[in-house]
Every structure is written in C-alpha cells, then in structure tokens.
Amino acid sequence: MSGARRCGDRRSERSSVVGDNRNGYVETDPTGRYGRLSEVLGKGAMKTVYRGFDELRGVEVAWNQATISDVLRTPDALHRMYAEVSLLADLRHDAIIAFHASWVHPSRRTFNFITELFSSGTLRSYRLRYPRVSRRAVAAWARAILRGLAYLHSRGVIHRDLKCDNIFVNGHLGQVKIGDLGLAAVLRGCTSARSVIGTPEFMAPEMYDECYGVGVDVYSFGMCMLEMLTNEYPYSECDNPAQIYKKVTAGKLPDAFYLLTDADARRFIGRCLVDAAHRPSAEELLLDPFLSPPQNHDDHNTIAHATAPPPPLPLACSNSSEEQEEEEAPAAKTTGMAITGKLNKEHDTIFLKVQIGGGGNVRNIYFPFDVANDTAMEVATEMVKELDIADREPTEIAAMIEQEIVRLVPGYKQHEYSYADDDDDDDVNGQPNPFYYLSSSPTSSQGSLCGVGPTSSEGFPGPHGKVDWSRDYCYYPPSSVSVSDDDDSSTSSLSAAVSAISLQQQHCSASSSRLGPASASASEDGGGHAGRPRQREGEEERRRRRMSRNRSMVDMRSQLLHRTLVEELNKRLFFNTVGAVHDIGFRDPTTYGSSSSSSSSQHRRRSSSKVDHKHHYMF
C-alpha cells in the first residue's frame, strides 16, 4: 500500500508541475517530460524549431514541429521527414546531433520530435559572427566533422547535403555536430546511389552522373573547409546553378580557393576535391598532418590573397583528354536533348532536368523554373549562353521547355509581346494587332488607344517616371490635357486624356523623330520621321526587345491610371468657385483668336488665383 501511495504521490506531483504551467509551456509531449516554449529558434520549408525543456534531465532541447498537412503534401516531403527521424533514432555518436523522442499530436495535427539544442546556431552563422578564427580551431572542427562522417559511412549512410548550414555549434564548448539528415541515403547491399539531390555549390561532379558513393561527402567536406578558412561561400562568383554546374564538371575550383596562402591548407582541401577515384576516405583524412595539433599556439586565420594561383586540380568528371576535346568542340547537329520536369506545388516551382548527348557521353543539368516569374525563352537563352550549346537555337529549347511545363501545369501559357512580330503582322494583314500599342501611323486609333501614340517614347516622361516601351519620343505635359471643371464629368477623365493625347500626336510628329527629339540635321532633312515605317531589325535585336504582353499592359494601365489621378488632383487644385463664376463668358480681347486654348486656360487660372487670395478661407 505504501508503495502504491508513493507511486501515486509521484504521479500527482508530476502532473502538478505540468498543470500549473509555471515554466510557461505552450504545449507538452504526451508523457509530460518535454515542454515547448513560444520562442522560435529557426524555420525551414517543412518544420519550425522551438526552444523546449526536458524536465527529467533539466536541460533545454530543440522541439521540431511540422504540420501533418505539410508533411503529407508530397511524397518527397514525407520521405525526407521520415528519413531524418528514423536515421537520427538509430545513430549514436558524439559528432552527430542527438535524438530523444518523436510523436504525433492528433488534435493539433502536428508531427513533433525532440533533438539536442545548439546554443550558437549553424557553423555558417557562427563563422560569420566571428570572422577571425585560428587554424587550430578550424582543425578541431574538421576532426569532429570527419569523425562523424566516418561513423555515417561505416553504417552505409551518405549525408548528401553536408555544408556549414547543416553543421551546428555549441559555442561555449567549441563543439560541432552534423545534423539535418533529411537528404541522407542508406546504401543497402550496394556501393552507390543514383539520385541527384543536394546543394549545387557542395555537390561533387559525379553526383551529376547519378552514380556515386560516400566520396561525395568528402568533396562536400572540402568545400566546408574552404568556407571555414576563407569565410567565402563556394562559387559565390557564379550567378546561377548553370554556371556552377559548368565550372564543377569542368574541374574548375571556386575563386575562394585562390585566397588561401597556407600551403598545407591548400593541399589538404585539394585532396578532398580531386576526382572520385583518387579521393581519400574520411578515415584517411583524419591522419593528414594538417589536422594534427600545431606546435605553436599563435597561428592566426588564413584569410589572405594568394600571391600566385596554384595549379588546377585533376578534372573530376572526365575520363580522358579526348573526352574533354569532344566537349569543347561544337556539338553535332544530331546531339540529342531531352527535358523532363518535376512540379513543387508548395513553392510554385518546376525542377527541370535537361539531358544532353547520347550513348556513354551524357550530361544532366538540373535547374528550377519559377512558373510565376520565369519565361521559357529567358531560360533557354541562358542555357545556350552558359552551357555553350551551339547546335540548337533558343527558340527550339524554349519550345521543349514550354511543352514540358504544359504537361506538368495544364492550362499554362506564357504570353509574349514582340514589336518585331507585330510589325510583320502589319505587313501581312494591313492593320495593327489589337494589342499593338506603337502604331506606325500618326492617326492610328490603335496606336493611341492606351495613351501611347506612335511618337511616344519611354512611357510618360517627366515627374511620373519612364518606361522604356519604344524608341519613339514625345512629351505631353500635364497642362496640355484638357479636363472638364465640372465634378459630374470626372468619370470621363480617362477618355478625355486619351482624346488629348491623340490630338497631340501631330504636333509631336513635327518636332521629333522616331529615335528621339528632332535635331538640327533632322530639320534640314525635312522634319521628323514619325510617318515612316519601322526599319527591319535582326533576329537578335528582336529577341532583345521582346516584352511580356501581360507586363506591358500592366505597365501602361498603371501609367494611365497614375496620369489620370494626377490630372484630377490638378483640376481640383486649380479650380476656384469664385474665379469660375467671375470668368463666365469672359475672354481677354488681347489673346482671343491668337492664342491657343491652353494659353486661355492658363490666363483664367491666373485670374482665379488672384481672387483666391481674397476668398481663401471660403473653402
């Protein structure tokens, strides 16, 4: 009985600790051992990491939480979450992040797991926070990372996404551990994996060939060492993954490698970045002299520019010099190309795989395609430029990309507006396209429909900014637009603005040319060229001046709306009730018949402004 009472007392004491919530928990695990606080430590694509507390051991922990809807959204997300939890539960090493518990909360519909907490965040953020670090400290970090890799590889696990962002630090202990095993692969009865996945800057060349082993982690470790020693992200000089792919497969090292002045550090990193056949294992790298404790204790950071660049390392992905010459030579017209894609609905992004070549010489290029912002033509042009594709035109590649996107996203259609194409349509049909905003005729109704006539250049200049729509030039000052002073007619201000712009076209044609304002030479030749047809341009110039039709219409409509609003404000600013009544039926005999309507309007505004000083407070 006494034993039962003691158990009951312990149970009631434990529930009271959780029930009174003196620790400020937001929620607890089913056993009541772990409590989650509201403080967010980090947030990823699928999960959010909160600060938690382990009441049994009295230590803080990392509470990882993901909603079930996000985990089950795609098979890849589910596989990644399951792989991370299952691997962490089976791994026990002082260089691998520790795993404590996992469970599903039915009512909250969340998946939760508890891991070790690292007070200083990732190694990348820690390194940026403290730029000056000795070689001795970096060597200690490297030994811990290599021990963790050796442990993973001994159990047939490839991390596949090793980088400083996935290495965590306890700054008060100088301790680093490997984490984020969501992309890890387990080799079951084989020695190689085939999926292409990871971060391009840290991916080994053989990963693009879809046949690799544990050596890819050693390559990634070399890039981590380069970042730790130079504080520079690998291949930061590249603008996109295509450039990174080109340099990696060509065996070119990042520019940060040439910042190293320490010969031992350069040699050590070079061992990690050679081709897979000559790359050492993690256990072999642990015996390298670079990682042995230094004799002197006053060594400093190795960030410095090298006086002379070291010789390039052996090519990582080629088998012979003949193969290199074949890649550098222009490809034959019969070179095959296949484009396949995979849709990521969470980020509205399609990951495209371009397979170039055939037989034994095949290149695979992977890159994302943003459905909302990218166009097939832009991506195709970039591919031709960055990958040196000489046997195919960008239009041909763009058609293949669009075909794959339409297959993944039914109903997708990218509209493009081309000035050159519209000129061709004019020659064939005899009349402009309904979306043609730059008519070659000064009296064309289509050309002035949206407020941009044939001689309008670069949108609306002046205080409203410019939009480079064409090479035509004409400036319509706000005062030249006639707007009614009656408040009831404010709804027709847009049509009034359009009419005024149409009336100004002939005046602008006499004082400007298609390429800019009229110069002295232009006037000597007989005036402007607004009525002349547009000259034909090369295919490259046409592609350069191509504009998305949707973006063009949005820009023009926004300019028109902005202009109309400004005119309405000007109308109310200069409108004066007393002056308007005073000037009814009045016309200045000195200016009547000789000045334009705009001059008379300005005179009435000056007269009304004089009366406005006397009746200012009537408004």
Swiss-Prot record:
A molecular-function term among this protein's GO annotations: protein serine/threonine kinase activity
Residues that, per the record, bind ATP: 115-118, 163
Biased composition (Acidic residues): 419-428
PANTHER family referenced in this protein's UniProt entry, alphabetically: SERINE/THREONINE-PROTEIN KINASE WNK WITH NO LYSINE -RELATED
Keyword line: ATP-binding, Kinase, Nucleotide-binding, Serine/threonine-protein kinase, Transferase
Gene responsible for this protein: WNK8
Enzyme active site: 180 (proton acceptor)
Organism: Oryza sativa subsp. japonica (Rice)
Protein name: Probable serine/threonine-protein kinase WNK8
Family designation: Belongs to the protein kinase superfamily. Ser/Thr protein kinase family. WNK subfamily.
Principal EC category: transferase
InterPro entries: Kinase-like_dom_sf, Prot_kinase_dom, Ser/Thr_kinase_AS, WNK_Ser-Thr_kinase
Compositionally skewed regions (Basic and acidic residues) per UniProt: 1-14
Composition bias type Basic residues, residue spans: 602-619
